């Protein structure tokens, strides 16, 4: 874990849910992002880059921004369901710690509420049983996560709240609107 600076206070950058769980105290509430935090594309970016470089070098002779195309291809694959968990063992450990300490986990995503069925299917795809029992909140990408937590009072009844996301902007919004929440920027490694 290392610290990155935001406009207000240091931000904890982690590569595993183990690092987050080390900070838990009595009755933690964990608010966890889904896309690119809990789930990631099943193939790394270099897979798509190498594929496109080979394809373009063998079949096409025109200039193309391979890195941009690879990123688009990876995003399409992710949206089509080629996903896996970023850190299965670390996430299991974190959930066990939450349960040991009498806490709770909720998921907060920028996805649209109309994608709820797909979200549940994505959870099943990566190995979660009974995702219909999960507490999943959707911002519909129309409100920041900090504003959502504050407006919906997601942190109500908990003294120790932890927020995990991969997007710096969402983390800053939580720090701004809910300064008592401990924020962790998740950066998975292939």
State the predicted function of each range.
Residues 158-190:
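Acidic, Mg2+-coordinating phosphoryl-transfer loop and its flanking beta/alpha structural elements
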Residues 36:
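Receiver (REC) domain active-site loop signature in two-component systems and cognate sites
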Residues 56-69, 181-190:
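A short, conserved beta-to-alpha structural element at the edge of catalytic cores
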Residues 110, 120, 125-145:
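A short, structured active-site edge motif that brings together acidic residues
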Residues 30-32, 79, 105-109, 135-137, ...:
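Structural recognition of the beta-strand scaffold that forms the well-ordered cores
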Residues 1-32, 41-53:
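Non-catalytic pre-domain segments flanking phosphatase-related domains
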Residues 58, 64-106, 113-120, 143-148:
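Short, acidic loop-to-helix structural element flanking the phosphoryl-transfer center
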Residues 24-26, 101, 153-159:
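Glycine-rich phosphate-binding loop signature in dinucleotide/nucleotide-binding domains
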């Amino acid at each position: 874990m290392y610290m990155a600076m935001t406009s207000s206070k240091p931000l904890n950058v982690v590569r595993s849910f183990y690092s987050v769980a080390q900070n838990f105290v009595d009755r933690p509430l964990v608010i966890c992002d889904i896309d690119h935090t809990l789930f990631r594309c099943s193939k790394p970016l270099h897979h798509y880059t190498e594929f496109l470089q080979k394809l373009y070098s063998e079949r096409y002779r025109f200039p193309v921004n391979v890195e941009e195309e690879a990123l688009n291809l990876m995003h399409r694959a992710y949206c089509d369901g080629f996903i896996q968990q970023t850190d299965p063992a670390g996430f299991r450990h974190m959930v066990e710690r939450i349960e040991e300490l009498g806490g709770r986990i909720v998921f907060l995503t920028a996805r649209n509420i109309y994608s709820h069925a797909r979200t549940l299917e994505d959870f099943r795809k990566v190995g979660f049983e009974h995702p219909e029992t999960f507490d999943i909140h959707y911002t519909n990408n129309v409100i920041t996560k900090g504003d959502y937590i504050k407006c919906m009072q997601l942190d109500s009844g908990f003294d120790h709240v932890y927020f995990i996301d991969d997007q710096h902007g969402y983390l800053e919004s939580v720090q701004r609107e809910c300064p008592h929440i401990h924020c962790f920027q998740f950066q998975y490694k292939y």
